[in-house]
Amino acid sequence: YYNQDVEVWYDPEKAKTMLQEANFPFDQTLVFYISSGNSVTERIAALIVQDLQKVGVKVQIEQVDFPTLMSNMLDGKHDLGIIGSGGTMDPSESREMIHPDSSVNFCQLKDTELTDIIDKGNAELTFEARKPYFDEYQVKIRERSPMAYLYTKNVLTAYNKRVSGVEVENFNSLNWSSWNWDIDAAQ
């Protein structure tokens, strides 16, 4: 579903101009919540802070235990935060992260346009029919930038050739579609 027309850009001067136009309070220090004890998140947060400082944004990293992080993020008591999430290659899985009524809408989005686009894509049955909706979704997410998809881990998946019904493209850590598996005892 990757939309190659959505450019990834890095333009500190443009970012600074956009913040100035939005009357961003440069004298305010933002609190950036991260989960303690995760060295990858700590390094990523440090890099993000460096980039924000380049455009004049003051940021203080606050390491908290995971329950506190989740509570702050869910209650909207945060300026910035990093939450890892599992998922699949299907963009419809991000619906809950952006739906106004969702319990995991960490960005506190109130606009339903993005979820409406996902719902239209989900109503379609084929990849070809769904792709235009998810292309549009990626464009809108990029325009609004309420969140950033930072990285995904490389994962190697293997299974015994006796097992059939395995849908590798739908693998994630939460859903292995094991109810579709069948084991050929003859092999």
Regions found by a protein language model. Name each.
Residues 1-20, 38-42:
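Structural transition elements
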Residues 23, 56, 77:
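Conserved functional loop/turn residues at catalytic and ligand-binding sites
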Residues 27-37, 59-62, 79:
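Short, well-ordered beta-strand elements
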Residues 36, 40-49, 70-187:
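Detector for C-terminal structural segments
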Residues 58-70:
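Early extracytoplasmic/lumenal segment of secretory-pathway proteins
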